[in-house]
Each structure stands twice: as structure tokens, then as C-alpha cells.
Amino acid sequence: MTVKTPVYLDYAATTPVDKRVAEKMIPYLTETFGNPASNSHAFGWEAEEAVEKARADIAALINADPKEIVFTSGATESDNLAIKGAANFYKTKGKHLITVKTEHKAVLDTMRELERQGFEVTYLGVQENGLIDLEELKAAIRDDTILISVMWANNEIGVVQDIPAIGEICRERKIVFHVDAAQACGKVPVDVEAAKIDLLSMSAHKVYGPKGIGALYVRRKPRVRLEAQMHGGGHERGFRSGTLPTHQIVGMGEAFRIAKEELEQDMAHYRKLRDIFLKGIEGIEEVYINGDLEHRAPNNLNVSFNFVEGESLIMAVKELAVSSGSACTSASLEPSYVLRALGRNDELAHSSLRITFGRMTTEEEVQFAAELIKSKIGKLRELSPLWEMFKDGIDLNSIEWAAH
């Protein structure tokens, strides 16, 4: 089996631009280069037409109205605009916000910033499977709660929360509901109407579109108000000023159009690859799947291999492009805060691999990856004194280690 290495299995970090998307973008760099806001000539009109077509394609994937789509530079900006924008607009009603400990840093750090500004934030824990307890969420709601932010699919463990149920709770209590859907679009069905979502963050580069472009869905009925975070020429109905990058927007629109058209086959492809991988690592002892396998984005696997050091594991499988933790925070040596929130100990949190499949991943590549990981785990454990002790039946938790 000849597989070209390194094999890219880090699609949750980013995806290559689909060739169909790249082709669609090129004319808007050199030919149809007008500013979409120039409304006095054909160059501007053509660019605006392309932007509106993309807006409609993006809206279609999430079952929204095109007028509800606001272009941003990516999901991080969308999260900032949604959370800061809503918190500041509705702060006269109350200053209490609710989110989850396993959210992306773009949400958590935005919440921290709002705490510095005098807001109060409740960070909900998760169960061992990564799902929040809806009763706990209900109990956390107060009369002064104005916003709840819960991600659709987790970037590290792929766990999919019960978004429609949370949407129901928020609508009933008239609380603004924000959802970070960067990892959900194109991987699971997303419907903002059915799920009663008020604000939804999206990114193009997680869906085979270009980097540097994203969008925020802002509900019109019932209308959700935001305070702008970027001031200027009043573009995007005043929500987000700045000249629209037509080529990027066209790319995102085409990527989302394809994602809607090919969602079923993409999902089936991911499930098949996931099953092949899980079958391939069967028989390795002390393997823990992190996060619920049922309620999960089909392209994500996060696996901890006990008695193996995470960093040495990444080095050992250098023919695979995989990650430990998310790409945004994998530079730090701290164990993943997401895995810690599941109750995993430091050792298991440190020995995790996030393997995420994509549209271009082949069955051969996944087979190769599973076999490689299996053989390397065996070799690394042979070198581990802890593994030897574990195999000898020694309870490692009962050992008193001498301090040096």
C-alpha cells in the first residue's frame, strides 16, 4: 500500500480550498475587481451581484434569509461581534452571560474581556461525554441573563450539543442565543430556524473555502440587535464596516453551496473513514475515545493512548499531520482544557491525538494511519517503565513517588 506522506488528518484545523472554489474566485481578483459598494458603475454592480449570490448560498446552507448574513474576517471575529455586540446592546436589561467551559478560545476569551468590563459570566461544566446537562443550564439562568453562547460542534472532541433544546430554552426565556458553528457547517445539518438560533458564527476555511473570511448570522424575526465593533463606512447594514473582499466572499459562497449539495455524501464518507480507523486501532489496550461517539461531528476522532507521552507520540507519527489539542492552543504545553473538563487526568489529556478527516481523505490513508499509530504505540510502550508496571498489575495511583 503506497500512501503519499505526510497524510493530512487535521481538517478541523483548516481545509484545502476546493479546486471548484479556487476557480470561481480567480476572476474576481483580476477582472471583476470593482468595489461592491461602488454603485455608480458596472464594475461595482457586478461585484455586488457576486456578493449577493454568495450571501444567498451561505444563507441556504443554514436555512436563513440572505439579509441575515453579515460578512466578517472569520469565526473569531463573528464570535466577538456576536457576544460583545449583544452584551453591550442589551446590558441595560442585565449583565449576566452563560457559556460552557469547553468552548473555543474565541468565545472564552471574549467572555473574559466582558468580565473585565463588569459583566458576570457563568461557565457551565460538561459531563464525561462532553455534553452539557440541560437541567444545569436551566438552573444557571437568572432574571438578568441576556445571552447564552454554546458551540454546535466542538473543535477538539467533535461533540455536538443539543442545540435545538437549548434554543427552545432561550426563546422561552427571551435570552439571546449565540452558537459558534465553525466546526458544524458542512459536517452536520444546520438549521437556524428549527434550532431557534439568534446569532451563528461561520468560517469559510473549515469548509474548503479561503482563510480570512467568515460570516455572522443575525436573526431578523424576532430582531436581534448588536452594537458594531468595527466602525467606518457603515457596510453590512452598519454591523461591520470595511470594504468587502469580493473574491473571498465568492469563495465562501461557492464553498457553502457545495457543502449543501454534498452534505449527505460528505457525512457518509466521514463515517466510513471513522469506522475504518476505529477498526484499525482495535486491539490496542488502554485506548480512550474522548467525547460522545453518538452525538458527534462524523469527521472527528479524539483518542487518548494511556502510558504514552503526547509529544513523543506526535513525533513518532510524523508521517501523519494530526494534532494534540486544537491548532489555536497546541503551542502551549498545558494539557487540553477541553479534555480536563471531561474529567480526564493529566496523563490521558497529554496522550491524546485529534484525528479529523476531510473530503479529500482516502480509505487507504486512514488504514495507513491506523496501522502506523498501532505499531508506534507498541514501540513507545515498550520503552515505558509505567507500562511495564501496569502490565505487572501494579496500581499506579497507589504509588507514592519520591520528591526530588
Swiss-Prot record:
<comment type="similarity">
    <text>Belongs to the class-V pyridoxal-phosphate-dependent aminotransferase family. NifS/IscS subfamily.</text>
</comment>
<keyword id="KW-0479">Metal-binding</keyword>
<dbReference type="InterPro" id="IPR010240">
    <property type="entry name" value="Cys_deSase_IscS"/>
</dbReference>
<feature type="binding site">
    <location>
        <position position="243"/>
    </location>
    <ligand>
        <name>pyridoxal 5'-phosphate</name>
    </ligand>
</feature>
<keyword id="KW-0408">Iron</keyword>
<feature type="binding site">
    <location>
        <begin position="203"/>
        <end position="205"/>
    </location>
    <ligand>
        <name>pyridoxal 5'-phosphate</name>
    </ligand>
</feature>
<dbReference type="Pfam" id="PF00266">
    <property type="entry name" value="Aminotran_5"/>
</dbReference>
<dbReference type="GO" id="GO:0051537">
    <property type="term" value="F:2 iron, 2 sulfur cluster binding"/>
</dbReference>
<dbReference type="GO" id="GO:0046872">
    <property type="term" value="F:metal ion binding"/>
</dbReference>
<feature type="active site" description="Cysteine persulfide intermediate">
    <location>
        <position position="328"/>
    </location>
</feature>
<dbReference type="InterPro" id="IPR020578">
    <property type="entry name" value="Aminotrans_V_PyrdxlP_BS"/>
</dbReference>
<feature type="binding site">
    <location>
        <position position="155"/>
    </location>
    <ligand>
        <name>pyridoxal 5'-phosphate</name>
    </ligand>
</feature>
<keyword id="KW-0808">Transferase</keyword>
<dbReference type="GO" id="GO:1990221">
    <property type="term" value="C:L-cysteine desulfurase complex"/>
</dbReference>
<dbReference type="InterPro" id="IPR000192">
    <property type="entry name" value="Aminotrans_V_dom"/>
</dbReference>
<dbReference type="GO" id="GO:0030170">
    <property type="term" value="F:pyridoxal phosphate binding"/>
</dbReference>
<keyword id="KW-0963">Cytoplasm</keyword>
<dbReference type="InterPro" id="IPR015424">
    <property type="entry name" value="PyrdxlP-dep_Trfase"/>
</dbReference>
<dbReference type="GO" id="GO:0031071">
    <property type="term" value="F:cysteine desulfurase activity"/>
</dbReference>
<comment type="function">
    <text>Master enzyme that delivers sulfur to a number of partners involved in Fe-S cluster assembly, tRNA modification or cofactor biosynthesis. Catalyzes the removal of elemental sulfur atoms from cysteine to produce alanine. Functions as a sulfur delivery protein for Fe-S cluster synthesis onto IscU, an Fe-S scaffold assembly protein, as well as other S acceptor proteins.</text>
</comment>
<keyword id="KW-0001">2Fe-2S</keyword>
<comment type="pathway">
    <text>Cofactor biosynthesis; iron-sulfur cluster biosynthesis.</text>
</comment>
<keyword id="KW-0411">Iron-sulfur</keyword>
<dbReference type="GO" id="GO:0044571">
    <property type="term" value="P:[2Fe-2S] cluster assembly"/>
</dbReference>
<dbReference type="InterPro" id="IPR015422">
    <property type="entry name" value="PyrdxlP-dep_Trfase_small"/>
</dbReference>
<feature type="binding site">
    <location>
        <position position="183"/>
    </location>
    <ligand>
        <name>pyridoxal 5'-phosphate</name>
    </ligand>
</feature>
<keyword id="KW-0663">Pyridoxal phosphate</keyword>
<feature type="binding site">
    <location>
        <begin position="75"/>
        <end position="76"/>
    </location>
    <ligand>
        <name>pyridoxal 5'-phosphate</name>
    </ligand>
</feature>
<dbReference type="InterPro" id="IPR016454">
    <property type="entry name" value="Cysteine_dSase"/>
</dbReference>
<protein>
    <recommendedName>
        <fullName>Cysteine desulfurase IscS</fullName>
        <ecNumber>2.8.1.7</ecNumber>
    </recommendedName>
</protein>
<dbReference type="InterPro" id="IPR015421">
    <property type="entry name" value="PyrdxlP-dep_Trfase_major"/>
</dbReference>
<feature type="binding site" description="via persulfide group">
    <location>
        <position position="328"/>
    </location>
    <ligand>
        <name>[2Fe-2S] cluster</name>
    </ligand>
</feature>
<comment type="subunit">
    <text>Homodimer. Forms a heterotetramer with IscU, interacts with other sulfur acceptors.</text>
</comment>
<feature type="modified residue" description="N6-(pyridoxal phosphate)lysine">
    <location>
        <position position="206"/>
    </location>
</feature>
